[in-house]
UniProtKB/Swiss-Prot annotation:
Interacts with the Sec translocase complex via SecD. Specifically interacts with transmembrane segments of nascent integral membrane proteins during membrane integration. Pfam families: 60KD_IMP (PF02096), YidC_periplas (PF14849). This is Membrane protein insertase YidC. One of its GO terms (molecular function) is membrane insertase activity. InterPro entries: Membr_insert_YidC (IPR019998), Membr_insert_YidC_N (IPR028053), YidC/ALB3/OXA1/COX18 (IPR001708), YidC/Oxa/ALB_C (IPR028055), YidC_ALB_C (IPR047196), YidC_periplasmic_sf (IPR038221). Required for the insertion and/or proper folding and/or complex formation of integral membrane proteins into the membrane. Involved in integration of membrane proteins that insert both dependently and independently of the Sec translocase complex, as well as at least some lipoproteins. Aids folding of multispanning membrane proteins. It is a multi-pass membrane protein. It comes from Pasteurella multocida (strain Pm70). Gene3D superfamilies: 2.70.98.90. Belongs to the OXA1/ALB3/YidC family. Type 1 subfamily. The chain crosses the membrane at residues 7-27, 346-368, 416-436, 454-474, 495-515.
Length: 541
């Protein structure tokens, strides 16, 4: 297989990968994992111990809005229920150079994405009769300079019981402790069940073949480390899983919100849909907690709302970092991402880091590249003998195959030697592809000149054009043309086809491919010099 055919193989594999991936997004429906369908559609989950008599099923008026802020985000919490109804990520712009913080959680008429939590059950305060209307001493709370933690209590009293919903924000952290402290000064034992859920407007993914994105639910349980559960899945079958530990989340490109319940408790993961209001919820419900008269109890949970920062998420909850979804090539993508961040920490430029990763990958793959070109050179040396066999045996395909295999054995040539290195390189490319798509670190990351966002397409299409030109040059430097006229025409158009494909790809990925082609050209010349000394290659065609 000569290098032009190699390009054709790469193109076919790459296009097949893109088509398969888009098919997965559009048509693949996983088997439902629900074991029980909850038929109640409401703001809070139905009680496991009774009917829906204690469930709030109608929208309620808004309470006061309390602002909580640390150095990385600003939250707005409604005193009615203590729900987080708005969040702004202070370190991330909504648009490139907009100086406007990115809004993750929001509660608008046309788009709902909020984080709710409360207490239900026998003596719950989030019921059909209404939700807790908390009292807060102040309207705005901000983490002060030199302060590492900010705790803000929301207080509600009912029938001799004081409920404190305490939000704890930490410096530099996107996870919030949301704890219920219950002081039972009544004359009887009370029972409550904690819950946390994320409510989101039912939406469809807005990605495309070049940059697929996912907006929908996900969860982790004791049986499953990480699994997506899309809004379409929720409409078909409500999630219902009993687990110890685990979490529930809503994902979108680069960002995630997740509820992490008490990891030592037995929790129920669930989803609900409210088609009338075009809403879906994914959440957890904790076990019954009994608080005797005169006793105090604390029920703990955490909420993550922010970017997909793998290192931080891994410390917050087991497998939460898997929400950075590298697909089946994760075992290659993770070390590549580590290498990318390591190089960036040295060069302080993500574009240069991509070039550095490309250099390292091509250096590691150089033995395979050399083996590929050596195999192709040997195959070219055998072409006269193979042509003679074709003329001698004519239509006798079986005899011709036998003689060809005999010739390969005598000359110690592997006819697949040129294909194998390409097949081995494809998983690495796919892993890099997903790394560049999933890494929030590349969002709005500049390179040089006109490339100010490596996660977006080149605004002037310069990199795709250069990439196409490098493919064309690589083709022309191939030692022999493709003999078949049809293949020749296909190969002549291949750089143009790839260039058009890459017009809409993230510029970081195009930069990788461009640099990879340039390195391949340099390696090709180095390998050819060695083959010339062995008499396996001639620069004169």
């Amino acid at each position: 297989m000569d290098s032009r055919r190699s390009l054709l193989v790469i193109a076919l594999l790459f296009i097949s990968f893109l088509v398969y991936q888009q098919w997965q997004l559009d048509y693949h429906t996983p088997k439902p994992v629900a074991t029980e369908q909850v038929k109640v559609s409401s703001d809070v989950p139905a009680s496991s111990a009774s009917s829906s008599s204690d469930i709030a099923t109608t929208a309620q008026a808004q309470g006061r809005i309390i602002t909580l802020e640390n150095d990385v985000f600003r939250l707005e919490v409604d005193t009615l229920g203590g729900d987080v109804v708005h969040s702004e990520l202070l370190k991330y712009d909504a648009e490139l150079n907009s100086n406007t913080p990115f809004t993750l959680l929001t509660n608008k008429a046309n788009h709902v994405y909020i984080a709710q939590s409360g207490l239900v059950g026998k003596d719950g305060i989030d019921t059909k009769a209404g939700r807790a209307n908390y009292q807060v001493d102040g309207d705005t709370f901000k983490l002060a300079d030199g302060q590492n933690e900010l705790a803000v209590p929301f207080v509600f009293e009912k029938d001799g019981v004081t409920f404190r919903k305490i939000f704890v924000l930490k410096r530099g952290a996107y996870d919030i402790a949301v704890n219920f402290e219950i002081d039972n000064q009544s004359d009887k034992t009370i029972e409550v069940e904690p819950y946390g859920q994320l409510r989101h407007t039912l939406v469809e993914d807005t990605g495309n073949v070049a940059m697929p994105t996912y907006t929908g639910g996900a969860y982790s349980s004791s049986e499953t480390n990480y699994k997506k559960y899309s809004f379409a899945d929720m409409e078909k079958a409500n999630l219902s899983i009993s687990t110890k530990a685990g979490w529930v989340a809503v994902l979108q490109h680069y960002f995630v919100s997740a509820w992490i319940p008490n990891q030592d408790a037995d929790n129920q993961l669930y989803s609900l849909t409210d088609k009338a209001n075009n809403l879906a919820s994914i959440g957890y419900r904790g076990p019954v907690t009994a608080i005797p008269a005169g006793a105090k109890e604390t029920i703990r949970s955490s909420l993550w709302t922010g970017p997909k920062l793998q290192d931080q998420m891994a410390t917050v909850a087991n497998h939460l970092d898997l929400s950075v979804d590298y697909g089946w090539a994760w075992f290659i993508a993770k070390p590549l991402f580590w290498l990318l961040t390591f190089i960036q920490s040295i060069v302080q430029n993500w574009g240069l880091a991509i070039i550095g990763v490309t250099l390292v990958v091509k250096a590691i793959l150089y033995p395979l590249t050399k083996a590929q070109y050596t195999s192709m050179a040997k195959m070219r040396m055998l072409q006269p003998k193979l042509q003679e066999m074709r003329e001698r045996f004519g239509e006798d395909r079986q005899r011709m195959s036998q003689e060809m295999m005999k010739l390969y054995k005598e000359e110690k040539v592997n006819p697949l030697g040129g294909c194998l290195p390409i097949l081995l390189q494809m998983p690495i490319f796919i892993a890099l592809y997903w790394t560049f798509l999933e890494a929030v670190e590349l969002r709005h990351a500049p390179f040089f000149g006109w490339i100010q966002d490596l996660s977006a397409q080149d605004p002037y299409y310069i990199l795709p054009i250069l990439m196409g030109a490098s493919m064309f040059l690589l083709q022309k430097m191939s030692p022999t043309p493709v003999a078949d006229p049809t293949q020749q025409k296909i190969m002549n158009f291949m750089p143009l086809i790839f260039m058009v494909f890459f017009l809409w790809f993230p510029s970081g990925l195009v930069l990788y491919w461009l640099v990879s082609n340039l390195i391949t050209i340099a390696q090709q010349q180095l390998i050819y010099r060695g083959l010339e000394k062995k008499g396996l290659h001639s620069r004169h065609k």
